[in-house]
Amino acid sequence: MEALVYTFLLVSTLGIIFFAIFFRDPPRISTKK
């Protein structure tokens, strides 16, 4: 059961980091359209 908790923490942390980077400059992919 500990592995599940650690996995969840890792995924949540990665998600937060990804969202932070994505919201910093989001119009990078959209501007190329």
Curated annotation (Swiss-Prot):
Gene Ontology annotations for the cellular component aspect, listed alphabetically: chloroplast thylakoid membrane; photosystem II reaction center
Cross-referenced Pfam families: PsbT
Parts of the chain that traverse the membrane: 3-23
Entry keywords, A to Z: Chloroplast, Membrane, Photosynthesis, Photosystem II, Plastid, Thylakoid, Transmembrane, Transmembrane helix
Role description: Found at the monomer-monomer interface of the photosystem II (PS II) dimer, plays a role in assembly and dimerization of PSII. PSII is a light-driven water plastoquinone oxidoreductase, using light energy to abstract electrons from H(2)O, generating a proton gradient subsequently used for ATP formation.
Subunit relationships: PSII is composed of 1 copy each of membrane proteins PsbA, PsbB, PsbC, PsbD, PsbE, PsbF, PsbH, PsbI, PsbJ, PsbK, PsbL, PsbM, PsbT, PsbY, PsbZ, Psb30/Ycf12, at least 3 peripheral proteins of the oxygen-evolving complex and a large number of cofactors. It forms dimeric complexes.
Family that this chain belongs to: Belongs to the PsbT family.
Name recorded for this polypeptide: Photosystem II reaction center protein T
Source organism of this protein record: Piper cenocladum (Ant piper)
Gene name, Swiss-Prot/TrEMBL: psbT
